[in-house]
């Protein structure tokens, strides 16, 4: 069966409109209608009821939807595996947005400076999603602060990095000659919650000792940094950013939070040799706040 027929069927079922489906697929409306007729002929069943502009799935069409989605996903994975086998240097690396923005992008720059022929895929997602992809062999290498506890996974501690509480203004305790509101305590300013892992949140809550709800929860370190001045808030960001962004002010009364950084991959991965080779390039060359063990 032609996968393009299934793709067209799913788009029509989503839009409930042949014209809009044609626009999404960069086809003519007649081409979309022809593909649907082809699929209906192959299956021997009508997939849509058509009453003027009212297009609905028939019971047969409803039953086909999950199978069409599954077949297309399987086909995409099959193509990826075939391409993967032909390009031995291709490697997919996954991490959360905050880790990519703060630590991993400079590391990638180093890798490409050393090996121009590298073929990498940098994947950004939540940790739980990346762990699932790793387990299902859809991801080769996971960089995380919390390694999953699975027997089939290999784990390497890359080092540690420090996070500090920043704001765009001084959060020192007030002095006698200070004007009112010139300084604020960390618990008195809006807080932006940046996702650095479940263990981090326990340390975060203990240090801040504040019951106020965050004004924003995000996975992006750069978004957090850009909003500090706008919101007058504070957030935990990489310690080495003090040099890169001198407008950021560290809260001196809040100690740094030190987090581990791990590399995780499948023990029987066919990419083990390449993974170990890449991990020989230390991340502390790119960000001094990461130290090798």
Curated annotation (Swiss-Prot):
| Keyword tags | DNA-binding, Repressor, Transcription, Transcription regulation
Its family? Belongs to the LysR transcriptional regulatory family.
Q: Which residues form the HTH lysR-type domain?
A: 1-58
Role description: Negatively regulates the transcription of the flagellar master operon flhDC by binding to the upstream region of the operon.
Its gene name is: hdfR
| Source species taxonomy | Bacteria, Pseudomonadati, Pseudomonadota, Gammaproteobacteria, Enterobacterales
Protein name as annotated: HTH-type transcriptional regulator HdfR
Cite a single GO MF annotation.
DNA-binding transcription factor activity
CDD domains named among the record's database cross-references = PBP2_LTTR_substrate
An example Pfam family from this entry, by short name, is HTH_1
Q: Which NCBIfam families does the entry mention? A: PRK03601.1
Q: Which residues bind DNA?
A: 18-37
> For this chain's UniProt record, which GO biological process terms are given?
negative regulation of DNA-templated transcription; regulation of DNA-templated transcription
